[in-house]
């Protein structure tokens, strides 16, 4: 945290960047954001990024196995290489400069996140279990 605070001060970003720590009001915080930066080098599914998409917040994510499941470059956010900090900075600046871009990507992001909702996941799992059940009955 100290390193981040130092960088924020060094680049005079105190008005633009806040380190919030643990919060109970994540949805409210996300909905007030211009974008959600998710620079993980390795990630499973990336629930935090999907939560941001569900709140219509465009995501700037690193290209990894997990983000490929939900990120579509320039559709619901921007995909960058994890080790290219300048690309992340450019993407963040691009998001801050265009409200229209944020709104368009945010709307498409919400639709993306719907694929990962509890209801959608439940439907898929029920179908899988049904297929397994039918397959097992045929083997008997």
Where are these regions (language model features)?
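Nucleotide-activated donor-binding/catalytic signature segment of Leloir-type glycosyltransferases, i.e.
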Residues: 3-21
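Aromatic "clamp/platform" in nucleotide-sugar-dependent glycosyltransferases that forms part
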Residues: 22, 41
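Short glycine/serine-rich donor-binding loops of glycosyltransferases
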Residues: 46-49, 67
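Short hydrophobic beta-strand element within catalytic cores of glycosyltransferases
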Residues: 58-61, 71
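Conserved acidic donor-binding segment of nucleotide-sugar-dependent glycosyltransferases
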Residues: 73-74, 78-85, 94-99
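A short, well-ordered alpha-helix in the C-terminal region of glycosyltransferases
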Residues: 87, 94, 101-115, 124-127
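C-terminal alpha-helical cap of glycosyltransferases
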Residues: 118-140
């Amino acid at each position: 945290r100290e390193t981040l605070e130092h960088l924020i001060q060094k680049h005079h970003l105190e008005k633009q960047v806040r380190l919030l720590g643990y919060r109970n009001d994540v949805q409210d915080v996300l909905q007030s954001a211009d974008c959600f930066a998710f620079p993980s080098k390795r990630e499973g599914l990336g629930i935090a990024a999907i939560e941001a998409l569900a709140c219509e917040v465009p995501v700037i994510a690193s290209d990894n196995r997990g983000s490929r499941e939900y990120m579509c470059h320039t559709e619901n956010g921007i995909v960058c290489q994890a080790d290219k900090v300048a690309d992340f900075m450019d993407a963040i600046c691009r998001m801050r400069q265009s409200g229209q871009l944020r709104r368009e990507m945010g709307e498409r992001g919400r639709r993306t996140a719907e694929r990962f909702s509890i209801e959608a996941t439940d439907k898929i799992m029920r179908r899988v279990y049904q297929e397994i059940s039918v397959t097992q009955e045929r083997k008997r």
